[in-house]
């Protein structure tokens, strides 16, 4: 897979019910927050990556959860944070306070099955 460079132009945290009237069936009870990262490649092509998690009151999240599907979603977020060097300790990283620092950070994108994704 060929990796291309892109730059994060927007990163926001939403509550699930800010985006949907009913929680999508694929989400578990403890998937309460959504992080949407928008990156732009050369030529203006925009790529969106979505991360589901459950933020604690202090803005951090836990990798451990009773549900394996929710845990794998959180692992994806943790890999993103460590791969792009936002933090070495994802569970101690305050997403609420630090998400604004993601803007203009360079990321890699890959094309798979006709879709572009942020490489993690």
Task: Name what the model sees in each region.
Residues 1-120:
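Short beta-rich binding modules
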